[in-house]
């Protein structure tokens, strides 16, 4: 038997280590739910396992979730999975405000890092303040937060996440944020002409609660739902109402029941925020919401005199413009209701 030199022993050991790394990386890429359990020490609910598995498979993902379902936490987990297993990933989280997007990074810093020593060893630096929100990994992956505004131009991303996308301006999304995806992650195998054609597709994800059907967010949700049935595309669209939160013990049923009995309870708001339903025109309605919404011009509301006696700021009614006509309309509810006042008064 020929004895190996010290160099051959070292190379053999390195080769075995790298082969093991490649094997486990392939396994965890194909099974992100197992990565969460083994690497991040997070036990996901069944619906969360399904969601994160589909997030890993798709190129386009839309998730309409009820409040309290934990979409920010799930987004934080997915970002860590992507950053660790795909070195050099540029992950951008865009939202209407920087604080909203920073919640994902805070979930990583405050909840995931303390429970996973392995994740802690992967992270090089965490910076979260008023001007910068970024997590840098030792493998050159970066998770960064940007404000969804025209000033965000110039960014690049292999994964673009729009948090509460219904609050983002459509023009900013199309002309600024989507242009971030003009970037291709360049792993080492891309330098080999044999594998140069195996470039990875970038991903874009839209997370939000529901809103009105006249809004562009509903059109995007419908498009993703239709494309999900096209076998030539990798689209996924999910909607989970508050019943899922109750089923998985993320929300107490009694809490929802108490909310529904309060005098300030809003049926429309509840359907959007808790049932994850987009609200459209009521059947038989004379005017659609879009028809009325396009005519809204008043920024500051008019208050009844008996409501503003102790509030001088509210007493300052908007000045009447030249040629302006003000019409008072009253919609009287013909059926009595003890729970709420269905009358509507507008100017």
Question: Where are the regions a protein language model picked out?
Answer:
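Pre-P-loop entry segment of helicase/translocase ATPase cores
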Residues: 1-60, 320
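ATPase catalytic-site recognition across NTP-hydrolyzing enzymes
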Residues: 242-332, 336
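Walker A/P-loop
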Residues: 58-78
